[in-house]
Structures are given as C-alpha cells and as structure tokens.
Regions:
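Non-catalytic pre-domain segments flanking phosphatase-related domains
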Residues: 1-7, 59-62, 171, 225, ...
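Conserved Lys-Pro-Asp/Glu-containing loop-to-beta segment of HAD-superfamily phosphomonoesterases
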Residues: 153-182
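Active-site neighborhood of HAD-like aspartate-dependent phosphohydrolases
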Residues: 1-44, 50-53, 57-58, 202
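A short, structured active-site edge motif that brings together acidic residues
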Residues: 40, 44, 67-71, 133-147, ...
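Metal-dependent phosphoesterase signature
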Residues: 57-101, 106
Length: 229
C-alpha cells in the first residue's frame, strides 16, 4: 500500500521571507485599489481565498464581487511572484532537500502538497527556493477551497484518481508548521506531523496534540522513519 505525504509549503518546506504578502498586496491594489488591513492581518495557516475575503470584506467589498475576482487575483499574484520571488532570497527550510531526496527513493511513497497557496503560485515559490515542484505528484491548494479543512479530502481524491489506489486517513500524513495544519489533518482523519520551522514554537504546536512534533526537518533518518511508520 502506498503512503500519501502531503506537505504544507510556507514555513514547512520553504521560507518565503514575506514574498507572499507582497504578491497579495500587488494583486489587491491593482484590482480593488485597496489591500484592506493587510499590515495587521495574521495569514498563518489560512488559504489565499480566506485571506483575500477577510481583507476585502473588512473594507466593505461584497463577498460575491470578491469571489468573482479570485481567478484574476491568483493570476496577478503569480505574475508578480515570477518577478520578485528570486529577489526575496527564498530558501528551503533546514533538512528539506535531504528529506525529499530520501523520500523520492521510497517505492511506496506518493509526495503531494497541501497548501493555502493557489495552484498557480505554489510551484513558483518552490522553484524560487530551489525545490523541484514536479516531484509532488498531487496537490490540494487554496484555490480549491476556502476552508483548509476541506483540502485533505481533495488531496486524497486526486491521489486515488492518479494511482487507482485508495487513499484515506489511514495511509495519509499531513506535514505542516501551524495549528491549522494539525486541525486539517484531524479533519481528514490523517496523521498530523507538526514542525516548528515557521512562526509557531514547538510548545504552541504541542497544545494541538499532533501525532508527531519536530523542531525542524533536519533529522532526516528519524523523520523518514516516522513518516514511513
């Protein structure tokens, strides 16, 4: 039986150094002439459509108008990202390249993404951090659902369609750096692996009782054993 490993991107695989916030500001200002309360908004663990909707409804823009413009917002974010991601010095988090190399050698592992980023932006961020996005065979993205808790089922379904095998919570692991990643793993009845390589300390993540908790992904052999167990 194959095991599906779904990785978050920002704070888990890469450090984006604020680049995502800049691309969002560019797109919102271009389309709506405002970025809403972006400067004070906590984006951690949220999907792009959730963030966009929160920011724009806060300044009185109707949800229907926002929803109609989401595809255009994603396109503008990706367009701006292609220009600035390399300049922002984005990099892989500690241990990530080594871990992905080892996982790619495992015959019964299917690598995937579960991220709040749109499907257009996600591969651009990975490339800018030196990670090949093509090694991730399936993905569930912010552009698929506003609620992050809906993404595990989407990822599992796409993995099943790709391979012809059944994927559910019993053979799926979700790896992320925020409480939202742990909660969405629980929503999908998947194994929750938390890593304190983002904005949240290990003690904070521990309060949400993930199945496994690491400071970072640097202990390749130990983490490999955990993910494959």
């Amino acid at each position: 039986m194959q095991k599906l490993l779904l990785f978050d991107i920002d704070g888990t695989l890469i450090r984006s150094n604020g680049a995502g916030r800049l691309t969002l500001a560019y797109a919102l200002d271009k389309l709506f002439g405002t970025v809403g309360p972006l400067e004070s908004y906590n984006m951690s663990g949220k999907t792009d459509p959730r963030i966009i909707t929160d920011l724009l409804t806060a300044v009185g823009i109707p949800p229907k108008e926002i929803n109609n413009q989401l595809p255009a917002i994603y396109e503008l974010m990706a367009e701006h990202g292609q220009k600035i991601f390399q300049e922002k010095g984005m990099a892989a988090c500690p241990g990530v390249p080594e871990l992905l190399t080892e996982l790619s050698r495992q015959p019964n592992v299917l690598l995937g993404l579960l991220t709040g980023n749109s499907q257009l932006t996600a591969p651009l961020k990975l490339l800018a951090a030196g990670i090949d996005p093509l090694q991730f065979k399936v993905g569930a993205y912010g552009s698929d659902a506003m609620d992050r808790n809906d993404l595990p089922a989407i990822g599992m379904s796409r993995a099943s369609q790709l391979t012809g095998e059944q994927f559910d919570g019993n053979n799926t692991v979700i790896i992320g750096d925020t409480p939202a990643d742990i909660l969405c793993a629980r929503a999908g009845k998947a194994t929750a692996v938390a890593v304190a390589s983002g904005w949240h300390a290990a003690a904070t993540l521990a309060e949400y009782r993930p199945d496994h908790l690491f400071e970072n992904l640097g202990e390749t052999n130990h983490i490999l054993q955990t993910l494959l167990s």
